[in-house]
Amino acid sequence: MSDNVPTIAAVATAPGRGGVGVIRISGKNLLPMAQALCGKTPKPRTATYADFTDTDGQAIDSGLLLFFAAPASFTGEDVIELQGHGGPVVMDMLLNRCLELGARLAEPGEFTKRAFLNDKLDLAQAEGVADLIDASSRSAARLALRSLKGDFSRRIHGLVEDLITLRMLVEATLDFPEEDIDFLEAADARGKLDGLRRAVDDVLANAQQGAILREGLNVVLVGAPNVGKSSLLNALAGDEVAIVTDIAGTTRDAVRERILIDGVPVHIVDTAGLRETDDVVERIGIERSRKAVSEADVALVLVDPREGLNEKTRAILDALPPELKRIEIHSKSDLHAHAAGGFGTGAETVIALSAKTGDGLDALKRTLLREAGWQGESEGLFLARTRHVNALKAAQEELSLAALCGNHQIELFAEHLRLAQVACGEITGEFTADDLLGVIFSRFCIGK
């Protein structure tokens, strides 16, 4: 990083009152600031108890000052942490004192961004920091920690090293174009390529599982008014999150709820009945429901077996994207018989279910996990993001194209290897546009 990088400061603990509050500061040559804050010269990696003082030498608070000298710190710069009492007024006074001493307020994720720019973390590890903070289940927290500790990155670095080795081997043959030798065959380049493709496939499979655990499954409940959508949402959530009445149109807005099934987040939207209405408020809710449908991975199509596919249900089905996966739910199974063959909704799975008694809920949850593609937590799994999956798919495609190259298309073969390396490098940040970095780190919390 540049020598002109400003000193940054932020409250690193959550807003509100607590026993301890932490101010984090990062920059170059911070010993003078430490001395101004507490009147002492702290030793690196040692907790110093002191009063934290204002410009007049009056105590603002008392607590611990920790000093981490560059480069042996989280950001790779000098870092100070002030551990004081966790009241918002005290934290605000301490932060303002740091700003008076020349620091500026840190942007979201700026401490982690500096760690990345100073080679303390790669981009996948930096994202692991945010994912650990945002983890919604124990499984997600365990896998995020693996990413933070570099498990995912080591897999990617291994792929990149193998790609570089194969590229060097292939590109060296370009120095001898006049030789009538099949260098790809002689160097077993194709055998090495096959091994690389298998390795990428393996990492991609793990990344897809990690992305499922991080991002989950988007599910919409659709069906005619009063077919039991809100009752099913309440049953899945285990709480009364949606109003249930016998009046059609009770759900006037899309009701959203997140549940966990075996640690996998499932985002469920109870749609306002997809129908035409003159009610302005209900019409807004219906538009939101249509947006939720467009973003869904799976639609739970609720059907009353007594009525089958009535005109209203057919109109709703016609409004669904044809590629959207569907699970047909025969609601209120405690009141009437289940139609085993289904009603032609386009669903591969039909489940009879009673939101009142809970019969069929476990079968539905198992089906949702199957539709999500979740295979269960396994050794070596790590948390991943959609961008990681897309990058690995791009590398997979480039290696597939390389495999199609003829024996004398060495330059094209080498170019596909290079593009596969670039795709893998995007995951760890070796090849990453500045605007992407801005988006990634802007989603962190301030102080991290």
Swiss-Prot record:
Its signal peptide is: none
Q: Could you confirm whether the keyword Hydrolase appears in this record?
A: yes
Q: Which domain of life is it from?
A: Bacteria
Which positions bind GTP?
226-231, 245-251, 270-273
Give me the comment on cofactor binding: Binds 1 potassium ion per subunit.
Annotated K(+) binding lies at 226, 245, 247, 250
Protein's job? Exhibits a very high intrinsic GTPase hydrolysis rate. Involved in the addition of a carboxymethylaminomethyl (cmnm) group at the wobble position (U34) of certain tRNAs, forming tRNA-cmnm(5)s(2)U34.
Q: How does it assemble?
A: Homodimer. Heterotetramer of two MnmE and two MnmG subunits.
Name by which UniProt lists this protein: tRNA modification GTPase MnmE
Instruction: Record the organism.
Output: Neisseria meningitidis serogroup B (strain ATCC BAA-335 / MC58)
